[in-house]
């Protein structure tokens, strides 16, 4: 047990449920007391925590696949840090762990919910992204849910984000015939082609997605990885070839909508083309974790898989990081650094 534990920790609370776009007054950065960990628990000084699109849904008081954040309680999410006190077998002071109690400086974590990580294998922040839940989402969504096979043509929306950029690269590494991505700026489009190896990419703000996708994929697509929804999903349904598959991972285009969003107008095409559209939650694919880490760590070590992070410094900027993510201000994984 460490002798000089901190006595307090700052943590972000949700204090009001956002209507539409989250506002600064919906959140509060508060101070909480820190105590020595009880039996079976560890105290972790967080070095990095993750902000993710799914968290917007947890701010609504609706029944969903994961419970909503409680008002006036600390929010949570992926975090990685260093053990500063342990009252659990198998964990020692100085160990680095991945856990689910982000949005705070010091986390009191049940040891059974912490996983040791190796800072020698990859930077600690990578365990929140390319080697973490984000990476497993890309890996499982492409290979398991979409049943990707060599020779498939793949379209990825939100392709410059943490999940999308990895999906496109994984498809290329496994032999895709063509990989197309959409992004929200010309700079991101250039990044997709020049750094991540996409065969084609377009800025969805420069014209109808349907037209730009048709130009980028004249022979159609076999797999669509959806991070956006809306007009991207409609365009993909139009471009998918017979027996095409779509992984529906996210719909960031409508997370802050205050009215019901219109559905794709071409759903009837699903019948004639015999398409398969399947939603995914990464938690259903935990069995792939060992294979995923082994394969992706190898591609990282060889330099074949590239990734970027957008890092916001300081816990006091957690709200800004989250809203920036929803606005698409990040390239790759959005992370808050407390290091």
Predicted regions, residues:
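Glycine-rich beta-strand-centered segment in the early N-terminal region that forms part
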Residues: 33-51, 59-103
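Glycine-rich phosphate-binding loop and adjacent beta-alpha segment
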Residues: 192-193, 231-305, 311, 339
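Short glycine/proline-centered loop/turn elements that form peptide/ligand docking sites
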Residues: 86-90, 181-189, 205, 209, ...
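C-terminal capping/lid region of NAD(P)-dependent oxidoreductase domains
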Residues: 2-12, 304-311, 319-339
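Mid-domain Rossmann-like dinucleotide-binding core that forms the NAD(H)/NADP(H) cofactor-binding site
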Residues: 128-207
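Short amphipathic alpha-helix with an adjacent loop that forms part of the alpha/beta core around
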Residues: 208-219
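NAD(P)H dinucleotide-binding glycine-rich loop of Rossmann-like/cofactor-binding domains
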Residues: 70, 75-82, 92-158
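A short N-terminal beta-strand-loop micro-motif at the entrance of redox/enzyme domains
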Residues: 2-4, 17-47
């Amino acid at each position: 047990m460490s002798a000089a534990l901190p006595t307090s920790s700052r943590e972000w609370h949700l204090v009001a449920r956002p209507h539409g776009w989250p506002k600064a007054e919906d959140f509060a950065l508060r101070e909480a007391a820190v105590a020595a960990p009880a039996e079976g628990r560890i105290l972790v000084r967080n070095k990095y925590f993750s902000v993710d699109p799914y968290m917007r849904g947890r701010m609504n008081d609706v029944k969903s696949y994961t419970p909503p954040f409680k008002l006036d309680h600390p929010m949570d999410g992926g975090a990685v840090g260093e053990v500063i006190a342990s009252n659990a077998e198998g964990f020692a002071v100085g160990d680095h762990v991945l856990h689910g109690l982000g949005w705070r400086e010091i986390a009191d974590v049940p040891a059974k919910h912490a996983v040791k990580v190796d800072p020698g294998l990859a930077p600690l922040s990578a365990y929140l992204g390319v080697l973490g839940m984000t990476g497993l989402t890309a890996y499982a969504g492409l290979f398991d849910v979409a049943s990707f096979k060599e020779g498939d043509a793949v379209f990825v929306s939100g392709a410059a984000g943490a999940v999308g950029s990895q999906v496109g690269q994984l498809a290329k590494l496994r032999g895709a015939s063509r990989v197309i991505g959409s992004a929200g700026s010309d700079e991101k489009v250039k990044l997709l082609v020049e750094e991540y190896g996409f065969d084609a990419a377009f800025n969805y703000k420069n014209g109808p997605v349907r037209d730009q996708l048709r130009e980028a994929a004249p022979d159609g697509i076999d797999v669509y990885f959806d991070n956006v929804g809306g007009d991207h999903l409609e365009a993909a349904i139009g471009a998918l070839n017979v027996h095409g598959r779509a992984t529906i991972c996210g719909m960031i285009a409508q997370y802050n909508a205050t009215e019901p969003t219109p559905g794709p107008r071409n759903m009837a095409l699903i019948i004639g083309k015999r398409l398969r559209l399947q939603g995914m939650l990464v938690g259903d694919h935990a069995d792939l974790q060992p294979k995923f880490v082994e394969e992706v760590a190898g591609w990282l070590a060889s330099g074949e898989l590239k990734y970027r992070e957008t890092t916001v410094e300081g816990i006091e900027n957690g709200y800004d990081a989250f809203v920036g993510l929803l606005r698409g201000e990040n390239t790759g994984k959005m992370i808050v650094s407390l290091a």
